[in-house]
Amino acid sequence: MLINNSKYYSLFLFLFFADLVYSQNSANGRIVDAKTNKEVSGVDIFINENQKPSLTTTSGKFTVQSDSLIYKLRFLRKNYSLESVDVTPQNASNIFVKLAQEKVGSIQEVVIHNEKPKYKNKKENPAYAIMQKVWERKRNNGLDKFDTYTYKEYEKIQFDANNLDSAFMKRKIFNKLEFIFNYKDSTASGKIALPIFLNEAVYENYGENRPSKRTKRLLTAQKTSGFQDNQIITLMAKNLYRDINIYDNTLNYFDIGFPSPAGETGFSTYDYNLVDTISIRGENAFKIRYQPKRTEVLAFQGYLYIDTDSYAVLGATLKSTQKINVNFINGISTELEYDNPDENTFLPRKFVTEIEMTPFSKKKTSKSIIAKRSVDYSEYQFNKPLEDKIFKRTEEEYNDKFVEKDDAYWVKARPDSLSKSEQGIYDMLDKLEQTPKFNRIVKLYETLGSGYYNITKGIDLGPIFSVYGKNQVEGDRIRIGARTYFTRNDPWRVQFYTAYGFKDQQVKYGVEGRFMFNRVNRFTVGAGTRRDILQLGVRLTNDDGIMARTFASSTIFARGENASLSSINQTNVFTSIEPWKNFQIRLDGTMQSIKSANPEGFNLMYYKNGDLRKTTNDSHFTLSLIARPGAKFSQTGIDRHEHGTLAPTIVLKYTKGVEGLFGSDFNYNKLQFLFYKPFLIGSWGKTVVSFEAGKNFNTVPLALQNVIPGNQSYSLAQNTFAQLNYYEFVADTYTTLHLEHHFNGKILSYIPLIKKLKLREIAFIRGAYGTLSDASKAINVEGFKYSAPSEHIYYEYGFGIENIGFGNLRIFRVDFNWRGNYLNRPDISTFGIKAGFQVGF
């Protein structure tokens, strides 16, 4: 396998996450009276945007220290004007401050001392009156007003390793890699920041609102830091950010809802304080400070800048609180600027977001990665005729040469010049790519990250995490697999596995090959075959393809004995295409024979024309329509990496069984539907909805029937019923609904002591209803055993605790499940506990 350059960036993050060391910021100087030049004592010194003084001086000299970077100091003393000094590496020592006297009682005193005025009710608060005007004149994105529009977008994404020091640089892991620190950048306090990734991109945006609504975002230029295949890290970085509208009630960060300070529901979360009137780009603006009423909630603090005449939002700063309860995140900071061409619309001008990420600790001194994304919007044009071909351009999106530009282009395209450290990133990562030691570390990291180990060029072994399993039929099971792998964007791939059970002493296998002819519409063909023991009936809407695996046939820990396994011999051919973005049409042809893998404990025998048969022979075609509107993917090859979004999944499948084709025993028609979607519910968290429905229109034996999916393992399994046994409910016609709400700690944050653990609560309810005809029961030898949840809707409910762990590493979840009805059945479980790992923010 070729070394995958895109993983260098991910490895770089991993290396800097590996060690945690302490570093401190400091500044010192002298304070005098501007008129007399005499030293002044009793001065309150504020660091950065802090609202409480970090020091009150006892003499004219001062020294301040902070766990975070000091970039600004503010000095305030009674009867003196506020003085602010920007701190840089050049002036951090021996800062000379002159304070000018003024009248007592200026508005700045109220602002800096954070003396929040006490009002009998919010209507007495002048900030409330201003925010009411903002809500009354709430603006819409101006792009929707025009028939057509175009604009230019410049995006810069940068990763910096932060809080480094000389001790960190001497770690053994950097032996023979010391040259990377020649590109370091020192902060004002002596800390070291090392730029490790830079991506620049220019987009042309086109839109048409009338007569039909169409948009096109075309990448016209891109420059990356060193490696050629950087797409996955670039899109991973972009996936950290979401497009936000400051007027919305909820702002989406990491698919977690934060209440907007400019939303109509803001006063339920924030306290507001009018602190000043300032000028922004020649416009007078109210400066309103806001902060959350409770620091334990997911919310921001910062400033809103409101036009004094039109009450439009000219800008905003959003900064997370110190107690932010988001995994792997130490802090979020966003600055927004808007243009307001008229009283009803706003246009984005500039967005800058910084995210500080650490793997384990939330201490400010921890080593971290600063991910910064800045976007500049310019060259707006409206109501100009747009040719139809603009919206049909696709080839350039898959052609790297189209976006290659020379240095002269980038000098002109950048709104601001690159810093010296940013310019050095390109050279540093080119050198790193040629270092043998780093490439060896890359290989180890790739193995842990992908689950595959490269043995020679283009061949990987794996997945290594699926080597061992256990079930009632096979006993201990060993599985070894391999795949072809040259690059992330391979247009073809062959996969193979073989497995052996020490109890049944049988060899199993599977092999599949796929080839993609066109990257634009992803026209793909594939074929495969397998002979294996599987747990059928754990999913209603199954994934098609030979290499799709089922968890239950190799579960190590389970509730009760699982004897309901099937021996399957299956061959599949398919073709698929995406005629529109994120909409796939797939046609499968499948030939299979299914029999019980444990005839003594699980009977799949059925009657056909009066004959008793133990093997179900089936040939069928399946047409699948799969829509994923809004989904994001990072590769263009046969296998794509999907990034987490709130995009829905909508699947419609029709299956036609053909009797007589390759010895098939049944004609049948089956229709299935699936809808899955996460929804943000403001500050109350996120609700995940999964709905499935289906119908078999003909009589088929148990091996081809719809099984309401149970879960007898102790692991979490999506879209299954935790308290159902396998094959407990079977249905010709079925509907299921899973509702799961993640509160993000909203309730537990009110409980003393518990709130310090930063646990998050989950509540869920699941239901299933279906019918099973007498004919479908009679066709099976043991049909009397099977029934559908037709008397009542079967339901189970419960709650869970997620975010269990320490520091920033909180990936464990435990669910407590109760069965709601059908309690008089034999061998059921009325209560159960499931646990598992889930990695996310």
Question: Each predicted region: which residue ranges?
Answer:
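Structural motif
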Residues: 24, 29-40
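Short solvent-exposed capping/turn motifs at the termini of beta-strands
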Residues: 31-35, 58, 138
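Short Pro-Gly-centered beta-turn/loop motif in secreted/extracellular proteins
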Residues: 37-41, 63-70
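A short, solvent-exposed loop/turn motif at the edges and junctions
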Residues: 47-49, 74-85
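Short, acidic Ser/Thr/Gly-rich low-complexity loop/linker segments typical of extracellular
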Residues: 50-61
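Conserved "repeat-terminator" motif of extracellular CCP/Sushi domains
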Residues: 95-114
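Structured extracytoplasmic
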Residues: 116-285, 291-299, 361, 365-458, ...
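Exposed, low-structure sequence patches enriched in small/polar residues
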Residues: 256-258, 382, 391-841
